[in-house]
């Protein structure tokens, strides 16, 4: 059974990766920054929870090369779930993997769009370029890799688009970006994590791009809103934000506030997630494992109805 280390294992998608790794009985490690007096109680509690489940947590900085090398010599698979602001720091992981010499697979922090095939507005493009640089460094070092394009984190974007969780300042207006007809892919985070752990250990996925594009999870904003209204019994006022407004905001807002609007434009206006055909060498994840199945969008919305969905959060860009 492969030993798996997850960088960013206490972050948003990283938490799902850790739990998925444990669910498949992999010895699981996390490399995380040391806690500080400013660390939140939830951060402390999460680490205690993971330790109680058998996770080995190594605290260290990305610049601690010798420490990382010694840790990597104890594991087989490296998964990076680092957030946007730390994308470039993955070069330290690459250098440590090269020095350790034993790693069977490295999965860099992709998990969103397929960055080598799209060209979004400049603020988001600058983020993707950092990811491309990491990919090229992996290839130049001849490291065994798998690139995962998981598309949209399902619960994250349901929270963002539909704001289903009740709170005092809740606004029942729903913003529709562009016409609302553009198709995108919505995958539940728990499924993304399970498939990622599987592909990380699957010889068929070595040095390949794996795209999570299950046909049943391709949907438009208008379809998603209609499904949610029918399921929740609620009715919403729809406010359209046209293409031109998103482009203007991407130009006028300061960094990093201009990045989220550029992402919204890429997904919901340009349709970048569905803008390319699968290549012969691509692997579509839903065809790989008969014992696994992606949660349908209907099933994802049921999690919100029952109160079992992840709470709202926002990605970090600085």
UniProtKB/Swiss-Prot annotation:
Free-text tissue specificity from the UniProt record: Mostly expressed in petals, and, to a lower extent, in sepals, stamens and pistils.
Which pathway or pathways does this protein act in?
Answer: Aromatic compound metabolism; phenylpropanoid biosynthesis
User: Which Pfam families did the record assign?
Assistant: NmrA
Q: Which InterPro entries match?
A: NAD(P)-bd_dom_sf, NmrA-like, NmrA-type/Isoflavone_red_sf, PCBER-like
Q: Which reaction does it catalyse?
A: eugenol + a carboxylate + NADP(+) = a coniferyl ester + NADPH; eugenol + acetate + NADP(+) = (E)-coniferyl acetate + NADPH
Q: Which Gene3D superfamilies match?
A: NAD(P)-binding Rossmann-like Domain (3.40.50.720), UDP-galactose 4-epimerase, domain 1 (3.90.25.10)
Q: Name one GO biological process term.
A: phenylpropanoid biosynthetic process
Which GO terms of the molecular function aspect are on file?
Answer: nucleotide binding; oxidoreductase activity
The UniProt site entry described as Confers substrate specificity is assigned to 84, 87
Which positions does the site annotation Required for activity cover? 263
Q: Please tell me where substrate binds in this chain.
A: 260
E.C. numbers? 1.1.1.318
UniProtKB keywords: NADP, Nucleotide-binding, Oxidoreductase, Phenylpropanoid metabolism
Q: Which residues bind NADP(+)?
A: 10-13, 32-43, 47, 83-86, 109-111, 131, 151-153
- Positions of the catalytic residues: 131 (proton donor/acceptor)
**CDD domains reported in the protein's UniProt record:** PCBER_SDR_a
Recorded family membership: Belongs to the NmrA-type oxidoreductase family.
Function, in words? Catalyzes the synthesis of the phenylpropene eugenol from coniferyl acetate. Phenylpropenes are produced by plants as defense compounds with antimicrobial and antianimal properties, or as floral attractants of pollinators.
The name of this protein is Eugenol synthase 1
Q: Which organism is it from?
A: Clarkia breweri (Fairy fans)
Taxonomy-wise, where does this protein's organism fall, top ranks first? Answer: Eukaryota, Viridiplantae, Streptophyta, Embryophyta, Tracheophyta
Q: Which gene encodes it?
A: EGS1
């Amino acid at each position: 059974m492969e030993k798996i280390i997850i960088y960013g294992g206490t972050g948003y998608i990283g938490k799902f990766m850790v739990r998925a790794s444990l669910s498949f009985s992999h010895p699981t490690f996390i490399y995380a920054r040391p806690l500080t007096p400013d660390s939140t109680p939830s951060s402390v509690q999460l680490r205690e929870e993971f330790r109680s489940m058998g996770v080995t947590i190594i605290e260290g900085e990305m610049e601690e090369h010798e420490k990382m090398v010694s840790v990597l010599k104890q594991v087989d698979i490296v998964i990076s779930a680092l957030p946007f602001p730390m994308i470039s720091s993955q070069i330290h992981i690459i250098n440590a993997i090269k020095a350790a010499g034993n790693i069977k697979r490295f999965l860099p922090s992709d998990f969103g769009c397929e960055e080598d095939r799209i060209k979004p507005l400049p603020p988001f493009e600058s983020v993707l370029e950092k990811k491309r640089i990491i990919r090229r460094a992996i290839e130049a070092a001849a490291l065994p890799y798998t690139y995962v394009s998981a598309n949209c984190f399902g619960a994250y974007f349901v929270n963002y688009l539909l704001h289903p969780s009740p709170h005092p300042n809740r606004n029942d207006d729903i913003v529709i970006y562009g016409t609302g007809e553009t198709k995108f892919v919505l995958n539940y985070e728990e499924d993304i994590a399970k498939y990622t752990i599987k592909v990380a250990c699957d010889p068929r996925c070595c040095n390949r791009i794996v795209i999570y594009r299950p046909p049943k999870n391709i949907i438009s904003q208008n379809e998603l809103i209609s499904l949610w209204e029918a399921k929740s019994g609620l009715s919403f006022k729809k406010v359209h934000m046209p293409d031109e407004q998103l482009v203007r905001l991407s130009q006028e807002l300061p960094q990093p506030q201009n990045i989220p609007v550029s992402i919204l434009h890429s997904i919901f206006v340009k349709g970048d997630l569905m803008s390319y055909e699968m290549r012969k060498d691509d692997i579509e994840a839903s065809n790989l494992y008969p014992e696994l199945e992606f949660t349908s969008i209907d099933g994802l919305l049921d999690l919100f109805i029952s109160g079992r969905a992840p709470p709202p959060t926002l990605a970090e860009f600085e």
